[in-house]
A protein has these predicted regions:
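Beta-strand-turn-beta hairpins that frame and shape the catalytic cleft
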Residues: 1-3, 113-122, 169-173
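Core catalytic region of metal-dependent phosphoesterases/phosphodiesterases
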Residues: 2-101
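Hydrophobic/aromatic beta-strand patches that form the interior of the parallel beta-sheet core
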Residues: 4, 32, 58-60, 124, ...
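Active-site environment of divalent metal-dependent phosphoester hydrolases
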Residues: 10-15, 39-42, 64-69, 131, ...
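Glycine-rich phosphate-binding loop signature in dinucleotide/nucleotide-binding domains
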Residues: 23-27, 53, 115-117, 149-152, ...
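Active-site-proximal segments of metal-dependent phosphoesterases and phosphodiesterases across multiple
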Residues: 76-83, 117-150
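Anionic-ligand binding region
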Residues: 138-175, 180
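Acidic, His/Gly-rich catalytic cores of divalent-metal-dependent hydrolytic chemistry
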Residues: 168-256
Length: 256
């Protein structure tokens, strides 16, 4: 089986549509949607595109999906509501209904699939044990190895930190699929992963300027920052140095 892994779409329907166009030209056998699906400017359009895919789809829940559920339920701690990302999640939650909320809430944290040439692959949002733990291109093998050992797979596919990488630690491999909708990379585009029989880190171009104009037109609170150029290495370093206390990259200036 061949698999396309699409992670961290974050409600960016134009980016998703561009990737789907590539998939239609060279279809996979299945698609993995790796979490953080609708927390972004066009949540319902994004869901409509994904639910219309003609291939088997395996879904994962990400930390932003949990945040949207909490926003729908009104259970976000008041202190977190001061954060721009949680304010944006509050906005997203106004577009979904109870059925969408319940569907997001029941998505699994881990999926295992047999992939051509790669045997069993473990798919998770961040790490096998957490949907928030941050692994970056700078993560040392001694920290990564026990995390991958806990998952038990020779190959683990993840996302969460929005930057592609291919790391090995303790004889196991971890590949980050990148982010379709909000990449923290060295250039624009929609980043994703194709598996079977090899591992292919992919990037699909699309009109980011037109996308940002759409985001602003619908009133998305973070429209100006979602696709703004970033210092990819500075963000990864900050994630690595400060873990889950790192600043939100949408407000990051590139100054250490």
């Amino acid at each position: 089986m061949t698999v396309a892994a699409l992670y961290d779409i974050h409600g960016n329907a134009p980016a998703l549509a561009a990737v789907i166009g590539e998939l239609r030209a060279d279809p996979p056998d299945a698609v993995v949607i790796g979490g953080d699906v609708i927390a972004g400017p066009l949540p319902l359009e994004t869901l409509e595109l994904l639910r219309g895919l003609p291939w088997p789809v395996h879904w994962l829940r990400g930390n932003a999906d949990r945040a949207v559920v909490m926003s729908f339920d009104g259970t976000v701690p008041p202190k977190l509501l001061e954060h721009p990302l949680y304010q944006a999640d509050q906005w997203v939650a106004t577009f979904i209904d109870r059925a969408d909320r319940d569907w997001l809430d029941q998505l699994p944290p881990v999926v295992r699939l047999d992939v051509d040439g790669l045997d069993e692959v473990l798919f998770c949002h961040a790490t096998p044990r957490s949907d928030e733990e941050r692994i970056t291109v700078f993560t040392p093998p001694e920290r990564l190895a026990p995390i991958l050992e806990q998952g038990g797979a020779d190959l683990t596919v993840a996302g969460h930190t929005h930057r592609q990488f291919d790391l090995t630690a303790g004889g196991r491999r971890m590949v980050n699929a990148g982010s379709v909708g909000r990449p923290y990379e060295h250039g624009p585009g929609a980043y994703w992963l194709r598996l079977g029989p090899d591992v292919e880190l992919r990037r699909t171009g699309y009109d980011t300027g037109a996308a940002v104009a759409r985001f602003a037109a619908v009133g998305y609170p973070l429209a100006d920052s979602i696709l703004a150029p970033v210092d990819a290495d500075a963000i990864a370093r900050r994630y690595e140095d400060h873990g889950d206390e790192a600043l939100d990259p949408s407000s990051y200036t590139g100054v250490a």
